[in-house]
Amino acid sequence: MVKLNVHNFMKKIATYVHPERGFLPDPDPLLELPLAYRAWDELNNAMPELLHNNDFRDALNNIPQLDPSGIKNGPELDRSMRQLSMFANAYVNWGEEPVKSIPKNLAIPLWEIAHRSGRPPIASHASIVLSNWRRIDPDGPIVPENLKTLQNFFGGKDEDWFYLATVGVESVGGCAMSKLFSCLDAIKNNKSNIVVTSLNDLASIIHKINLALERMYEHCRADIFYHRVRPFLKGWPDDGIVYEGVNEEPKIFFGGSAAQSSLLQTLDAGLGITHPSDKSGPFLIQMRKYMPPNHSKVISLLELDPILLKYLNKNKSIELKDAYKKCISGLNIFRKKHLEMAIHYISDQEKKGEEGEGTGGTEFITFLTTARNETHLLMEKE
């Protein structure tokens, strides 16, 4: 096992994670692209109405093929990635007839933008959540009440809230990263009192994350989510989708998933929670490919050396172990709540009609159950 150089790690982390926002972008997501890309902004704004009228595919087929080389890295790239990937999901997943390919006027720029973003050319958590909000009061907090989405499929309050409540979870969890990293820094300097304080602070933040997660129920109804939001977030079918003008070989990519959030995997890695089961571990590893590369690097760096677990094994302090156990307990509660939420929004809806996609929902429930059991097992060991 590689030994983690905490000093070098902290220097790298400073460029990957915001000390307050965590994995949310800073500055706020861009509100419009340069004029040369107005066609994308216009389709972005018209998408809900076009989907309602079953006109989206025709509209997309008729937009010009734009050269993405003029898109700058940073906010412009993030906005383009969100727009183009959500266009692709809408094109493939909603229409009277299934399609086998994405037209080249979308496929070519999407492929290039995705390559520059370091992510697959499909809508993922980083686009539909992390880069899909603006503040109503620019000086106000990043909380659901002060946010509006930048892009929707059908639109409506339920879809808005699904994205914005998740932004709220990411926002609350942003400070968790600085507490975790201050804990690691204190271990390096053998300051046990700061380690304990940092872990207790982290446990408090995890509790707030759990409260933020529960807010999903406030304005996102399960039947609306299942029938009007979830279909657009699906991955590509088993026979794949061709990106015209890029490659004639059909590609298969996963759809958007909360497992693509870097927040929970970072907490797992920092606290030493592992997922050895073949029902959880491989899926979590795959989901890292859908994260912004700098975010997944944080997880990989933390996994190099479980210094917190080693410190716990050497230090017999009851205060230290209690503080650590609070963190694990909080994550166990999070996974329990997330499992209950998935059952409510997916499994229960599948049972109500013939439109359910039983296997997809069942597999995700199995993953969540296994991940929760692995967290619970570590809690019982401590």
Task: Give the positions of each predicted feature.
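Surface-exposed peri-terminal alpha-helical interaction modules
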Residues: 1-382
